[in-house]
């Protein structure tokens, strides 16, 4: 059983001595993905109630489990018959494991005192060794981590001070600074002359380098981060989590140092960043105005131009409308019939009964002298009934220039599929023209396609492109390697090889 001597470093499961190989295999399958048992034993679980009496809780196989997904260690008891977890206790910080008896081990649980009563003392011995070795290793690592912050977090930049007057005392000064106990011993002895401001010369080749705000343990300090650096990180798509991540932030810090430091990065950023933004911001505004400015003009043009054409087309446009509107009749009388209905449209301007008689004579004389005289009396009565029933289709028949204009406007409305107007039939060419103008505005507002300027791509050259390339390489490295191994050094008490798949 040499495998149980160094369980924390093993990646294989350690079964119980009292179980068969098949039972141990079943136990291993109950552990869960990426979980390993470092020691296993058949036990009874006891808990001390308020009366300080041990009470049995359950029986099963106890396992010291290394849970890689949770990055922690647990004591877990499984029922191998039902294949379920009966109890668990995480090994918290300062966990103390006692063994008052070789077969009876106790420790403080989350809610009460807990004890494991082992069925086999050999198993109890191996189990105890696995737990104590793990606790000891964690203790040593935590002490190392506690001592580490005492040292310098950042390498101190050395400055060469050329002054011959203090070169003879440089070695002594370093001893005084680095060895405190020797300094205390020499206090009683004769004191050497201390340096004064006059003895210290001015430094040569001194350059002030801005502080990046990066700490090797906590990453970048987001509260005190330089605004220009933050702008650079935003342009490269670097998140706050990446700036806080120890490894990723170190990659970014190394990049800044290799580039020449914070000031060099900021100067490069100032030289490159300003030019691109203006064009990208100035580009979008121009396109929108053209559509808006071009949209309104067309409708008015139609409104002004519409009246002139109708008069010239009046003689030619008047004949066509009648045939399509009356497909059943080809004889000349129908056109006059259509001519006479117009009198009703004039009703709004004058009395209902008065308008019919006057218009017929005038229209008959202007458009077709022979046909109008015979039919005037009969057609008079039919139009009124026809108007209420078929007002939408029979109304566009007025003759003359106004009639032609009205016919043209109405034909245009039919072609544009807006004839289902709820408003009353227009009584004059002016009203019809106004309707056409309104309809034209509605159609115009949705007819034009919008002109869109392609967005200017973000700059990927210079300092921004270089940093983005570094971050892409970092991302590929993270995804290509195992996720568990990448995050190993983030644990406070674990080594790089602690967590495994």
Swiss-Prot record:
<keyword id="KW-0131">Cell cycle</keyword>
<dbReference type="GO" id="GO:0030478">
    <property type="term" value="C:actin cap"/>
</dbReference>
<feature type="modified residue" description="Omega-N-methylarginine">
    <location>
        <position position="304"/>
    </location>
</feature>
<comment type="subunit">
    <text>Binds actin and the Arp2/3 complex. Interacts with CDC42. Interacts with FCHSD1. Interacts with FCHSD2. Binds to SH3 domains of GRB2. Interacts with the C-terminal SH3 domain of DNMBP. Interacts with SNX9. Interacts with the WW domains of PRPF40A/FBP11. Interacts with PTK2/FAK1. Interacts with PACSIN1, PACSIN2 and PACSIN3. Interacts with NOSTRIN. Binds to TNK2. Interacts with SNX33. Interacts with NONO (via second RRM domain); the interaction is direct. Component of a multiprotein complex with NONO and SFPQ; associates with the complex via direct interaction with NONO.</text>
</comment>
<dbReference type="GO" id="GO:0005737">
    <property type="term" value="C:cytoplasm"/>
</dbReference>
<feature type="modified residue" description="Phosphotyrosine; by FAK1 and TNK2">
    <location>
        <position position="253"/>
    </location>
</feature>
<feature type="modified residue" description="Phosphoserine">
    <location>
        <position position="481"/>
    </location>
</feature>
<keyword id="KW-0597">Phosphoprotein</keyword>
<dbReference type="GO" id="GO:0051301">
    <property type="term" value="P:cell division"/>
</dbReference>
<protein>
    <recommendedName>
        <fullName>Actin nucleation-promoting factor WASL</fullName>
    </recommendedName>
</protein>
<dbReference type="GO" id="GO:0060997">
    <property type="term" value="P:dendritic spine morphogenesis"/>
</dbReference>
<dbReference type="GO" id="GO:2000402">
    <property type="term" value="P:negative regulation of lymphocyte migration"/>
</dbReference>
<dbReference type="GO" id="GO:0005634">
    <property type="term" value="C:nucleus"/>
</dbReference>
<feature type="domain" description="WH2 1">
    <location>
        <begin position="401"/>
        <end position="418"/>
    </location>
</feature>
<dbReference type="GO" id="GO:0051491">
    <property type="term" value="P:positive regulation of filopodium assembly"/>
</dbReference>
<feature type="modified residue" description="Phosphoserine">
    <location>
        <position position="480"/>
    </location>
</feature>
<keyword id="KW-0498">Mitosis</keyword>
<keyword id="KW-0007">Acetylation</keyword>
<feature type="region of interest" description="Disordered">
    <location>
        <begin position="263"/>
        <end position="403"/>
    </location>
</feature>
<dbReference type="GO" id="GO:0009617">
    <property type="term" value="P:response to bacterium"/>
</dbReference>
<feature type="region of interest" description="Disordered">
    <location>
        <begin position="442"/>
        <end position="501"/>
    </location>
</feature>
<feature type="compositionally biased region" description="Polar residues">
    <location>
        <begin position="442"/>
        <end position="453"/>
    </location>
</feature>
<dbReference type="InterPro" id="IPR000697">
    <property type="entry name" value="WH1/EVH1_dom"/>
</dbReference>
<dbReference type="InterPro" id="IPR011993">
    <property type="entry name" value="PH-like_dom_sf"/>
</dbReference>
<dbReference type="GO" id="GO:0031410">
    <property type="term" value="C:cytoplasmic vesicle"/>
</dbReference>
<feature type="domain" description="WH2 2">
    <location>
        <begin position="429"/>
        <end position="446"/>
    </location>
</feature>
<keyword id="KW-0009">Actin-binding</keyword>
<dbReference type="GO" id="GO:2000370">
    <property type="term" value="P:positive regulation of clathrin-dependent endocytosis"/>
</dbReference>
<dbReference type="GO" id="GO:0051653">
    <property type="term" value="P:spindle localization"/>
</dbReference>
<dbReference type="GO" id="GO:0045944">
    <property type="term" value="P:positive regulation of transcription by RNA polymerase II"/>
</dbReference>
<keyword id="KW-0677">Repeat</keyword>
<feature type="modified residue" description="Phosphoserine; by TNK2">
    <location>
        <position position="239"/>
    </location>
</feature>
<dbReference type="GO" id="GO:0099175">
    <property type="term" value="P:regulation of postsynapse organization"/>
</dbReference>
<dbReference type="GO" id="GO:0003779">
    <property type="term" value="F:actin binding"/>
</dbReference>
<dbReference type="GO" id="GO:0030050">
    <property type="term" value="P:vesicle transport along actin filament"/>
</dbReference>
<dbReference type="InterPro" id="IPR003124">
    <property type="entry name" value="WH2_dom"/>
</dbReference>
<feature type="compositionally biased region" description="Pro residues">
    <location>
        <begin position="273"/>
        <end position="387"/>
    </location>
</feature>
<dbReference type="GO" id="GO:0005829">
    <property type="term" value="C:cytosol"/>
</dbReference>
<keyword id="KW-0804">Transcription</keyword>
<keyword id="KW-0488">Methylation</keyword>
<dbReference type="GO" id="GO:1903526">
    <property type="term" value="P:negative regulation of membrane tubulation"/>
</dbReference>
<comment type="function">
    <text>Regulates actin polymerization by stimulating the actin-nucleating activity of the Arp2/3 complex. Involved in various processes, such as mitosis and cytokinesis, via its role in the regulation of actin polymerization. Together with CDC42, involved in the extension and maintenance of the formation of thin, actin-rich surface projections called filopodia. In addition to its role in the cytoplasm, also plays a role in the nucleus by regulating gene transcription, probably by promoting nuclear actin polymerization.</text>
</comment>
């Amino acid at each position: 059983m040499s495998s149980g001597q160094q369980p924390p470093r093993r990646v294989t499961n350690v079964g119980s001595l009292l179980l068969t190989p098949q039972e141990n295999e079943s136990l291993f399958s109950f552990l869960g993905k990426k979980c390993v048992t470092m020691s296993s034993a058949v036990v009874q679980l006891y808990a001390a109630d308020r009366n300080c009496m041990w009470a049995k809780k359950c029986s099963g196989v106890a396992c010291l489990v290394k849970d890689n997904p949770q990055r922690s260690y647990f004591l877990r008891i499984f029922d191998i018959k039902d294949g379920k977890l009966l109890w668990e206790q995480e090994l918290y910080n300062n966990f103390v494991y006692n063994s008052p008896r070789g077969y009876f081990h106790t420790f403080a649980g989350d809610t009460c005192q807990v004890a494991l009563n082992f069925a086999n003392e050999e198993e109890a011995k191996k189990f105890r060794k696995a737990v104590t070795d793990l606790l000891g290793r964690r203790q040593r690592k935590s002490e190392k981590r506690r001592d580490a912050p005492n040292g310098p977090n950042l390498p101190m930049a050395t400055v060469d001070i050329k002054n011959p007057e203090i070169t003879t005392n440089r070695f002594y000064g370093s001893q005084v600074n680095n060895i405190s106990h020797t300094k205390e011993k020499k206090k009683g002895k004769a004191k050497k002359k201390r340096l004064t401001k006059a003895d210290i010369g001015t430094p040569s080749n001194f350059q002030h380098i801005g502080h990046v705000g990066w700490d090797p343990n906590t990453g970048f300090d987001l509260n005190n981060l330089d605004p220009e650096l933050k702008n650079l990180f935003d342009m490269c798509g670097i998140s706050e989590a990446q700036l806080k991540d120890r490894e990723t932030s170190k990659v970014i810090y190394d990049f800044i140092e290799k580039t020449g430091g914070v000031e060099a990065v900021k100067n490069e950023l100032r030289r490159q960043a300003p030019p691109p933004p203006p064009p990208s911001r100035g580009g979008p505004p121009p396109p929108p105005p053209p559509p808006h400015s071009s949209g309104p003009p067309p409708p008015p043009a139609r409104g002004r131009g519409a009246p002139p054409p109708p008069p010239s087309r009046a003689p030619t446009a008047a004949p066509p409308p009648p045939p399509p509107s009356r497909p059943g009749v080809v004889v000349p009388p129908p056109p006059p019939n259509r001519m006479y209905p117009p009198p009703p449209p004039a009703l709004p301007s004058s009395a209902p009964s008065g308008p019919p008689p006057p218009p017929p004579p005038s229209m008959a004389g202007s458009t077709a002298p022979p046909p109008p005289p015979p039919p005037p009396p009969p057609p008079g009565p039919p139009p009124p009934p026809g108007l209420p029933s078929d007002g939408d289709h029979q109304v566009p028949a007025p003759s003359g220039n106004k009639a032609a204009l009205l016919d043209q406007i109405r034909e245009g409305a039919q072609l544009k599929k807006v004839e289902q107007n709820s408003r009353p039939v227009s009584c004059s060419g002016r009203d019809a023209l106004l309707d056409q103008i309104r309809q034209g505005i509605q159609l115009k507002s949705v007819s034009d396609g919008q002109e869109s300027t392609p967005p200017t791509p973000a700059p990927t050259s210079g300092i921004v492109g270089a940093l983005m390339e570094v971050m892409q390489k970092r991302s590929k490295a993270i995804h290509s390697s195992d996720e568990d191994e990448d995050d190993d050094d983030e644990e406070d008490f674990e080594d790089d090889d602690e967590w495994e798949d």
